[in-house]
């Protein structure tokens, strides 16, 4: 359908959400077994719908139908919970039927990045940050089918880049910044892996398109001046508190960043902003924030991250 394994489009999320809603409604019961497991309703395949497996640019295909009324080859059909799910799938694919492909790539420092079809993530450039050590630039572009040169054969739209996963935040369409988050900074496989996705909408002539890119950042920076983070302790707060200031500093004078490791809160600049406390939470509720400083390759080493924890307590009712 012009998308792919790495797709993060809103319409894909909505489709997955619809499937999950159907699964919950049809499978879950209120019964719980002695060992604490929820009893599931069995699935009767004859109560569902069938739709033919999708083939690119297929001109004739069997119409999706109730199981017993399906006219196509049942051995080459997919099963769906109901009519709504089957028709949602058909509608998604019909959008791209008969349309031409368009292809995406990435430019870094004005040069088109190499594309290797043997790799799982087929574009894997080197991390090339600006002077601050964490900001980098990438530009999504339309290319020919070999991804070796730019092309004008594409939909009348501009490709955009979005985050899939990893320690990164998007600043604008071509600017990104290393930004660690609650996954942590001690995972050998994941801490340094950034994955982004270029996407391009389709039109009447072209299918939509996506292309992923993976960047491995060095973690940690081990060359250069050592640095340490000084992070004062944080006081407990009561429910209803709006925010809490953070005042960590680096002994090398570099700006310190933060992420929430656990608890109902978010980071906005140098502030912890509290979010609604989940129902049935047990008080006091623990919040842990991590201060980090990545350093600058060859000049300043990555600082050891520093954690600080505090508790959200129930607001005391003051007696008059």
Where are these regions (language model features)?
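Alpha/beta-hydrolase-fold serine-hydrolase catalytic core, especially in secreted/extracellular enzymes
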Residues: 2-141
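Solvent-exposed beta-strand/loop surfaces, strongest in extracytoplasmic domains of secreted
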Residues: 100-320
């Amino acid at each position: 359908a012009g998308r792919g394994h790495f797709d993060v489009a809103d319409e894909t999320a909505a489709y997955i959400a619809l499937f999950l809603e159907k699964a919950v409604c049809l499978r879950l019961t209120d019964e719980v077994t002695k060992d604490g497991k929820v009893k599931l309703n069995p699935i009767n395949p004859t109560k569902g719908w069938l739709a033919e497996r999708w083939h690119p640019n297929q001109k004739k295909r069997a119409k999706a139908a109730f199981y017993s009324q399906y006219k196509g080859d049942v051995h080459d059909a997919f099963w769906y919970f109901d009519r709504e799910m089957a028709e949602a799938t058909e509608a998604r694919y019909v959008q791209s039927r008969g349309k031409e492909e368009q292809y995406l790539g990435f430019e870094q420092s004005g040069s088109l990045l190499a594309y290797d079809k043997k790799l799982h993530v087929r574009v894997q450039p080197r991390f090339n940050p600006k002077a601050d050590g964490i900001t980098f630039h990438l530009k999504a572009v339309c290319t020919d089918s070999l991804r070796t040169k730019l092309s004008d054969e594409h939909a009348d739209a501009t490709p955009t880049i979005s985050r899939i996963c990893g320690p990164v935040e998007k600043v604008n369409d071509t600017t990104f910044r290393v930004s660690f988050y609650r996954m942590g900074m001690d995972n050998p496989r994941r801490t340094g892996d950034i994955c982004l996705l270029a996407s391009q909408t389709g039109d009447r002539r072209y299918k939509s398109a996506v292309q992923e890119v993976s960047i491995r950042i060095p973690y940690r920076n081990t060359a250069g001046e050592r640095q340490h983070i000084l992070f004062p302790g944080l006081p407990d707060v009561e429910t209803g508190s709006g925010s809490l200031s953070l005042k960590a500093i680096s002994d090398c004078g570099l700006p310190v960043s933060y992420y929430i490791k656990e608890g109902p809160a978010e980071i906005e600049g140098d502030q912890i902003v509290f979010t609604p406390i989940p129902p049935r939470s047990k008080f006091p509720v623990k919040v842990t924030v991590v201060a980090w400083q990545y350093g600058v390759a060859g000049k300043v080493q990555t600082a050891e991250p520093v954690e600080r924890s505090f508790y959200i307590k129930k607001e005391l009712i003051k007696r008059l």
